[in-house]
Amino acid sequence: MFSIKLSKILLYALCLCGALGFSQANITVSKAHPRYFEKNGATWIPISTNYLPIQNFEEAEKYFKHFAENGGNAMRIWVSTDFLEIEEQKEGKYNPEKLARIEQLLQLAEKYHIYIKFTLHHLRTIAHNTSPEASWCNSQALATKFKNVSEYISSKKGKKSYLKRLSVIAKKCANHPYFYGWELWNEIDAAVPEAEWLPFTREMLGKVKKLCPNQLVTQTLGSMHAPYMDDYYKKLAAIPNNDFLSIHRYLDEGDKWQQYPVVKGAIDSLVSNAVNIGLEFTKENPKPIVINEIGAVQPNHAGPSALYPKDTEGILLHDFIFAPFFGGSAGSGNTWHWDHYIEPNQLWYHFGRFKNAIEGIDPVAEAMQPFSFSSMNVNCYGLQGKTKTILWCRDLANNWKTELRDGIPAEIKRNFEIPLSHINNKYTHYSIYNPWTDKWERHIPIESNKALIPAFKRSIIVILEE
């Protein structure tokens, strides 16, 4: 009985997801360079943020507008929050008003040219009653049929329910020109043990991909902050149907989970370490690495970082956005805390600076590969291509500890130079972009086999060309 009914659901959803393929977003993993994405055959670099609409569409449009005006082109949105959850009172009963909201959200996406990925669930509990502070991740609706999350993701009736809800949402968005991906579950390891989330993930990645072959499908785990999480990520990375590897990592000075020292230090190292782990885990089956959540928290994820109100210049945000791409990720860091940090401090312009920095850069056409080196107390993270190399150079003399914790202003870095022996001797000129002043200096001749870098504060972008 289950297999017959489920097959009908799969067929129905497959028709929904494929019927209007001509209008889909058509964002895919590049076949030429599978570390990156393409849109309609051209390289697509996501400049992305997380955003959870919670109040009304006036507020949502404000966020979309601010983000789009500053170069943003992608958002990750939980479709399971109170504002959007269609299954809000009883399992299998879907609220048409919430479905209409999903359509309205996609209208905003189209208006502002922002591509959307939906996270299908963020639940950690299924119960009739829960404490107010835990209600954000509980489903009372599913408690009308399931006793807990384990039953929901492990039983035949639970998986049938999961796919039925997906098919209803897919009817509204799967072929929308600004909808590109599904995420099975936010940080599913926080809800159930590995013995349950791993088989569910393997099965559902395949089933959701079969239902919606025109969208990307992925799964997410919690912050990559300790050895046990590395093991989880390694197993996730090995699943072929996981179209790209989503990594979460936060600045966290706590010790509850034996957090690595690297997640308590400079953001460029925190990020590059995570990206390198992802690249290593997927070296046999290359796919894009995406820093799907990045931010700063109070120790042991007790809340948004106390550093945020102090960071009016976006010292943290700059590193959150830039470090992933220059470390080998497929796009910018997908930032969290839009409501506690980015919007209150009006820091959206940092996304625009990233867009300006990568102007004319095509990692697929150039077959770019990540590399890094340190010189003169500066960490340099680069992407080397056939005819050009782009570098993000981060001064080690200052970071969030010196500026935000200790209150020491960043010093100007002077007399910095990049010997071409670190990279390649074929380049003849270079350009400089300062992301803090939004100023370019272009086509500077290379002399004495090195690039002489003008004085800068915190970081600088260098593009070397033949």
Language-model-detected regions and their locations in the chain:
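Active-site mouth of glycoside hydrolases
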Residues: N26-K256, P261-D268, N273, E284
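Flexible glycine-rich beta->alpha loop in the catalytic core of nucleotide-sugar glycosyltransferases
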Residues: H121-L123, G295, A330
